[in-house]
Amino acid sequence: MSHNDTIVAQATPPGRGGVGILRISGLKARDVAQEVLGKLPKPRHADYLPFKDVDGSALDQGIALWFPGPNSFTGEDVLELQGHGGPVILDLLLKRILTLPGVRIARPGEFSERAFLNDKLDLAQAEAIADLIDASSEQAARSALNSLQGAFSARVNHLVEALTHLRIYVEAAIDFPDEEIDFLSDGKIEAQLNGVIADLDAVRTEARQGSLLREGMKVVIAGRPNAGKSSLLNALAGREAAIVTDIAGTTRDVLREHIHIDGMPLHIIDTAGLRDASDEVERIGIERAWQEIEQADRVLFMVDGTTTDAVDPADIWPDFIARLPKNLPITVVRNKADITGETLGISEVNGHSLVRLSARTGEGVDVLRNHLKQSMGFDTNMEGGFLARRRHLQALAEAAEHLEQGKAQLLGAWAGELLAEELRLAQQSLSEITGEFTSDDLLGRIFSSFCIGK
């Protein structure tokens, strides 16, 4: 589809509401105003007008806002019609606008895409619009707004600028080898490179925090039947999300709860008790449990403290530990401390965290909450943070790898040409975040995930 078309879409959620907004952007927006309103409203002023059908009869009446380009969200002429939020009324008005030549329904995210293409915002800011809409906590919303206002982009642009200056210095050393000063060995380039690496590490740390705020952590509760997995899910969720009985195998499918710990999203998954089951339904539930375990960020290995004194997971259930994916973090949770009389709290056992608690009474659950937050490195006190996506983390990691490779070339062989190439690749990776260097394929995937009307 052409970006020269004029596009229209409903900017408010579908369904009934007090207000319904249609947004129009493009060369024909002026014609839409003349046809539907009978006049062109004063720029950036609210005008209360009837919205007219083809025969001149009123379909609705409301507020019209006119934003002539380039001083608009998309950089094009933009008209917003704010009428009553009834689905029938909005549908009639939308059909009326689509009778005009050169006007079509917008694709999901096309308004934001046009804003990006017209340099009204960069790609990280455009993504922040969707993240702000999807924010699941106050902290996530504030961080998304910071990204929208350019906080993340400013940090990335600072790195790109520093790399640009460093590349100039390195390439000057390559192009003018006969100068009296040996630019590659006088220590200045190494010092500048170390400075960029340190700045990039700081941005990566903040980006990981932003990714946690956006993506959250997937925690799977696993263990034998009747270990108290569902009771722990209920304790963490603060409500009776799962049925709890003394009958082994009560939970036969995956149960999911979404909670927040000091702003960090946590996806808690309760699974069927793991054992050799003859019942077909229970067997399917156990297989699904293993599928969830394999995709987890952390596993809470639930142990009934009344059945064993062991604390090392390899001693408690070696077959379970052997089947777990390599490098998957495990927290051993010894449950039923209210019965065993164990001291509540957290300790380390052979590289694994061990938490003693009572899921039934809730004693020790706060210790587990703090452990989950700390295990992901989540900092609740970070001010002015920004949200980050997985593609951002990947781009930052690639840039860091190129800088380390470049440093190795500099220190190992004084290879200026190879250092210059690694600096170029690092700069390219960073530019993918803001969209200065991005494939059309990636743009399509990003903007297609947006709401229609955004």
UniProtKB/Swiss-Prot annotation:
Enzyme Commission number(s): 3.6.-.-
Cofactor binding, note field: Binds 1 potassium ion per subunit.
Record's subcellular location: Cytoplasm
Binding site for (6S)-5-formyl-5,6,7,8-tetrahydrofolate: R23, E80, K120, K454
TrmE-type G domain residues: 216-377
Binding sites annotated in the UniProt record for Mg(2+): S230, T251
Matches recorded under InterPro entries: G_TrmE, GTP-bd, GTP-bd_TrmE_N, GTPase_MnmE, MnmE_dom2, MnmE_helical, P-loop_NTPase, Small_GTP-bd
Annotated GTP binding sites: 226-231, 245-251, 270-273, 335-338, 358-360
Superkingdom of origin organism: Bacteria
Family designation: Belongs to the TRAFAC class TrmE-Era-EngA-EngB-Septin-like GTPase superfamily. TrmE GTPase family.
Name of the protein described by the UniProt record: tRNA modification GTPase MnmE
